Amino acid sequence: MKLVEMLKSELPEYSIKIPSIDNDLLFRPFLVKEEKTLLLVSEEGNMTDILRTVKNILESCFTDLDLSSITLAEAEYLFLKLREKSVGEKLELMYKDTGSSMPYPITVELNKVKVPKRTKKLNDSISITEKINITLSDITLNDVIKENVQIYNPTQDDIIKILSIMIKTINVGEETLTGSDISIKEKIDFIENMTEKQLEKILTFYTNAPSLDHKFTHTINDEEKEFELKGLNDFFGLVSLT
């Protein structure tokens, strides 16, 4: 047996549970070469490239993981749990205080990050008019990469694009159009021609979607400060106060 094959055969295996999947997911730690690739991409700062690398690592480390069947937030959570088992429970981030030129290191305990869940149960079927009904689904990591959409700190245009991606079907009378049958541009035009009240129905589903959200406190110069991390992007750089 070759040395590399021997190493791989001795890798530990872990299990984890998320809401979208009934069975436990099995995974191995990521390897040095995989971490190196992620670090190199992270230094360049392009979030789409970072997420594409995260996707590749997740698919390599997890057994039978279908990223199109779980929410973006769940994929982000799985990556944090993977990092926890691969490197350690503590993650050091930098916080830059107002009026200070030097950032402070702060420690995040990854084992305390909770699995993302929808804030409240909502109907995914929404009536836009008496004749038009749509069904929505939560955005996935695959969606974000495929459509190259800015999911972190989105502009108004980004949010409309995200909403268009979330449209699963459009029912007009007895005719049903699936989201894949309609281009993103057509769905964006569809949303932009809604009234504010119609748009609000879709926004409610979006704003209550599962999200990776972690609140914690850290003492800096004898003062306890409260922080909040939202989305995987916050776990890659500077953090701010809540």
Question: What does each model-identified segment do?
Answer:
Residues 1-242:
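Long C-terminal interaction/binding lobes of large macromolecular proteins
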